[in-house]
Amino acid sequence: RNGAQGQVFDGGHKIKSVKVISVTKGKSTETEAKFTISDTRMQVFLPQELKSKGGSVKIKIDFSFIAPFEGSDRMGVLETKNGKIFTIAQWYPRMCVYDDVRGWNVNPYLGASEFYLEYGDFEVSITAPSNHIVVCSGELTNPAAVYSIEEQKRLAQAKLSDKTVLIRSADEVNSLSKSVSGATKTWNYKIKNARDISWASSAAFILDAAK
């Protein structure tokens, strides 16, 4: 839509496996599931029918993809002097909506149109380079694992302040965080009763907060 800027598009999601998870007598079993893909839609064939009146199924999809430089406004990679900014949206498989008017709504995603989505609860873990800040829909559940002691103090101050408090200033952007050893940090977020979830990650982010 916005031009590839010389990037070779690899076709989108690479599906490694699709499995159905079942639990019998406390033991979890993963079974390979057959599936078919048509444009942006996947149909998964369950090994047995889903029971009515409250039946449920857990499906595990192992997939990967390369974020495009230009992602139709919702996703992309921006080059800055302090590092790349990655913005990620519509990046994971979604269930089609089942409603009492049309049944399954299986229209494909259509560019600039709005998406018809179910509400649900999300829990995500995002592993990024240790000098990145990751922002995401919802609530960060492990701030002590990803922010330095000083940043945690500033966040605590911001929760009580009507004025903006800098958590990570422009002068600190190039300073590596000492809060976690190793090359990466994992940020855990959760949100309840939401239509969707998106996130962004960069070493170039300046962060502030207030009550």
Describe each region flagged by the PLM:
Residues 42, 48-133:
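Surface-exposed, acidic/Ser/Thr-rich flexible loop segments
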Residues 2-83, 173-182, 186-187:
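A surface-exposed beta-strand-loop module
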Residues 1-7, 23-30, 54, 59, ...:
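Proteins with a high burden of low-complexity, intrinsically disordered sequence enriched in S/T/G/P/A and R
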Residues 90-104, 110-211:
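Hydrophobic helix-coil surface modules that form long, contiguous segments used
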